[in-house]
Amino acid sequence: TSSFEENVRAAAAAGCEIMVSTDHLTLPASMDAPGDVQVTAADLPLHRAAFDDAVKLASELSPSLKLLYGFECDWYPGCEALVEAWSAGAAVRLGSIHWLGNPGDIMAGAAGAAGTESVPRADLPESDAGWIDYDADLHVWKNLGVHEVWRRYVDAWCSACESPLDFDVMAHPDLPMRFANEG
């Protein structure tokens, strides 16, 4: 991954006029307890401060470069209030699907937050719930098979499009292709 500063320097050098930040938004502990694939809730203020510093740098390096603060927001059943809270202040919400199935107790707290260490994981190996693009754990593919993963992915993707979150844009409608031959 790269920092905001690195991205601004590269964008300025390439003559870009607009750059949108879309790091992965905070997730519930039931989906990613250690916070490995996201900006954790505890890191959101530092993340925003780093973005604001990048805006200042962009104004020095390339005054015509406009930066937009955003997040890639995973959609999962019941996520709306959490996504709205965690993405507050974002100018862009990029909707995405990476998780299929029941996300578990999403209201038990944000990943990495104190007191969430004992929140049960929702992606148990025998379940049909979990990440579809995590190559270290392909249990969803093995348990459901390629066709069912695709079917559920399309259903979830369409649900995200119809969500009251009103995403600005939806990402990778073809994400299952990444592992379609693995399941």
Q: Which role fits each region the language model picked out?
A:
Residues 1-77, 113-114, 177-181:
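An N-terminally biased module of ancient metal coordination in phosphate/nucleic-acid-related enzymes
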Residues 2-10, 77-85, 152-160:
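Short, acidic/polar
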Residues 3, 40-43, 47, 83-85, ...:
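General structural signal for secondary-structure boundaries
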Residues 13, 54-62, 83-91, 161-165:
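Acidic (Asp/Glu)-rich catalytic clusters
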Residues 32-33, 81-82, 105-108:
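Short aromatic-enriched loop/helix-cap "lid" or pocket-rim segments at secondary-structure transitions
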Residues 41, 78-92, 183:
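Short, electropositive alpha-helical surface patch
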Residues 88-90, 94-183:
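Domain-core and long-helix interface of multi-subunit machines
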